[in-house]
Curated annotation (Swiss-Prot):
Gene3D superfamilies: Zn peptidases (3.40.630.10)
The protein, known as: Peptidase B
Location in or out of the cell: Cytoplasm
Subunit structure: Homohexamer.
HAMAP family hit by this protein: Aminopeptidase_M17
Pfam families: DUF3663, Peptidase_M17
Annotated organism of origin: Klebsiella pneumoniae subsp. pneumoniae (strain ATCC 700721 / MGH 78578)
GO MF terms held by the record: manganese ion binding; metalloaminopeptidase activity
Binding site for Mn(2+) 1: D200, D277, E279
Catalytic activity: Release of an N-terminal amino acid, Xaa, from a peptide or arylamide. Xaa is preferably Glu or Asp but may be other amino acids, including Leu, Met, His, Cys and Gln
Length: 428
């Protein structure tokens, strides 16, 4: 085992020989990070990425100034999808160490799950991983049901079944109940719905290779919302919450769905498929119908839903949509408290009407006349939320995954959003 490289924090600028803008320097004791009070967490994360890039795989966070958030910022930048890294953590009090340990367990689970190859992580495996994580955190407070394949069709989950039927791996709906009250009749406080497309080829509206090569990550919404529930439980969530993961492959075969097909949903809506690569909203619709039936105070769905959200925000922010201004502001306050980046994008009543079809109530994609793709996607989902004006948040997870490394992040999943959603769920 190699000796650990000591990483210390300093509020003094680096020696002038390192340059006036230097944020880190090397000394006889190890590496010093020079905080300037402007964006200290970002500075630590960027420095950690550079330290990892130098091939240093064993570090000790030493000296004064370390706390949970600073140690976590270091790990967020230091962790990568391949190779082993060892960190000797700073001395923290019990509460801070517990918080750090829970982040390491749960958010690393989210990142590792999103990074897993599609060959290893199909719909059933994703659902089972979610069950294992949540049962490990909450034990007997968890109950669940897994419905798959033809059982979905027979029970009316036609959006999920339609999208997933083209794969040899059957589509799966995970319906999970976290009930800490012990009362089977306890009201449901929140319902969480996640898009779990374990690989998205685009179907017959096939993607180019440059857009398909990262589509193992199209289940990022499901992983994020699962991690958020698990993390909220570790922070003392004492209200009943239900989780719905809509898991499928979107592949091409003789049994795959086709353009012009019409899906009949349980809430009476019909949808014409005019783009098989707009499949996420088709599976989420089934989960949102179930969520609405629970009459919760809060519904949150999370999905890597549109390229339009990434065009607007890049990979740095998650996109937030809601008709409920007060609730949207609560989510944004939670994001600020957790130092995670969310940005609200427009969602208006007219977006609900920008999906016209000649043969059904809705088209699953907007036409060229209605180019606000992220907003029309949110508008589509609103048709499956019973009381869409209140208590519903849609998160288009544009910050879930990066195809290549940047100064703060390695290539792959980020885990962003888990803490924000957990904060909202546990806020009084």
């Amino acid at each position: 085992m190699t000796e650990a490289m000591k990483i210390t924090l300093s509020t003094q600028p680096a020696d002038g020989r390192w340059g006036e803008k230097a944020t880190w320097s090397i000394n006889n004791d190890g590496i010093a990070l020079h905080l300037n009070g402007k964006d200290d967490l970002g500075l630590i994360q960027r420095a950690a990425r550079k330290i990892d890039g130098m091939g240093i795989k064993h570090v000790a966070l030493s000296g004064e100034g370390w706390n949970t958030d600073r140690a976590w910022a270091f790990w967020a930048g230091y962790k990568g999808p391949k190779g082993q890294r060892q960190v000797e953590w700073p001395s923290l009090d019990d509460a801070q160490r517990s918080e750090l340990d829970n982040r390491l367990t749960i958010i690393d689970w989210v990142r590792d799950t999103i990074n897993a190859p599609a060959e290893e992580l199909g719909p059933e495996q994703l659902a089972q991983r979610a069950v294992d994580l949540l049962c490990g955190v909450a034990g007997e407070k968890i109950s669940y049901r897994i419905t798959k394949g033809e059982d979905l069709r027979e029970q009316g989950y036609l959006g999920l079944h339609t999208v997933g039927r083209g794969s040899e791996r059957p589509p799966v709906l995970l319906a999970l109940d976290y009930n800490p009250t012990g009362d089977k009749e306890a009201p449901v406080y929140a319902c969480l719905v996640g898009k779990g497309i374990t690989f998205d080829s685009g179907g017959y509206s096939i993607k180019q290779s440059a857009f398909m090569d990262s589509m193992k990550s199209d289940m990022g919404g499901a992983a994020t919302i699962t991690g958020a529930l698990a993390f909220a439980i570790t922070r003392g969530l004492n209200k009943r919450v239900k989780l719905y993961l809509c898991c499928a492959d979107n592949l091409i075969s003789g049994n795959a769905f086709k353009l012009g097909d019409i899906i009949h949903y349980r809430n009476g809506k019909t949808v014409e498929v005019m783009n098989t690569d707009a499949e996420g909203r088709l599976v989420l619709a089934d989960g949102l119908i179930d969520a609405s039936a629970q009459k919760p105070e809060l519904i949150i769905d999370a999905a890597t839903l549109t390229g339009a959200a990434k065009t607007a925000l890049g990979n740095d922010y998650h996109a937030l949509f809601s008709f409920d201004d007060a609730l949207a502001n609560r989510l944004l306050a939670s994001a600020q408290a957790e130092n995670e980046a969310f940005w609200r994008l427009p969602l208006a009543e007219f977006h609900r009407n920008q999906l016209p079809s000649n043969f059904a109530d809705l088209n699953n994609t907007g036409s060229a006349a209605y180019p606000a793709g992220a907003s029309t996607a949110a508008g589509f989902l609103s048709h499956f939320v019973e009381n869409y004006h209140q208590g519903w948040l849609h998160i288009d997870c544009s910050a879930t995954y990066r195809k290549s490394a940047v100064e703060q992040w390695s290539a792959g999943a980020t885990g962003l959003g888990v803490r924000t959603i957990a904060n909202l769920l546990t806020a009084e």
